[in-house]
């Protein structure tokens, strides 16, 4: 299956210093049948210090987390950091985006909106969420609502039977978790006599879009590792052998953002990981020619190898953890650039701060 996503527009309000709504167009032309996202892949957001560039990246990361992690707003430490992220004056905000979706040349345009606010108990709650779609070949068509929720209650989704089933399953939950993250947990329980129809598929497309989002930002989520190890433990307990490369890449990126540097590599993907590290070594040698190689120190860990990288120089070996901050940032940057080359939507905050001017001459 060939799956491609392209971010058309992004609207943000109430994140960090964004106290007034802002709108970003990543493609200003009318979408036509011959639209080719490959020609419009690289965009730059620039402005003065304090103009809101990092706030935009933060909003994208928040959007991704809300869509893929149904427990995101339940975490106490996450709530504490989110309260600091929401604009102090507005105490509420929203994110809205238009997404071009092409799956095996079946094209759609999705419009997703989610709003949130700090309530009297000092916690962040989702106040409204909706998803609409229209034909991707004819962008002037009107949007059709896929689902909508307000104040924690589902107001529309699918036909009457599907709606009643899903509404009961999500009762009093949708102010604490997004509908997209909630519906995936129902897949095994969904009655076979219920018609899932295109609405369900469209929500899955939205979830897939969220997985394709890749955000490189300095203020790492220090609580990510705990959630990831819980996910891995769940995989082990359920004896799921279908641990895909896509899933692994997602976990790997998030672990790299967290405090630890060791990563868990599924044994069936270890050869691919070695190839990736060989490319990483060549990339770092551009900036640090004295590096001879990067080797993987692996330890057996059930279905995984626990891997740590060793930086090999002519007269000494250095654990990755003790490499210079600049080189570690370049190593992280490599993974994000590689994912961008693989078609993922990648946001990199302060890209110029990662690369010294001497390398750009």
Predicted regions and their residues:
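Conserved P-loop NTP-binding catalytic core
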Residues: 58-119
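Conserved ABC ATPase signature
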Residues: 41-50, 301-338, 348-357
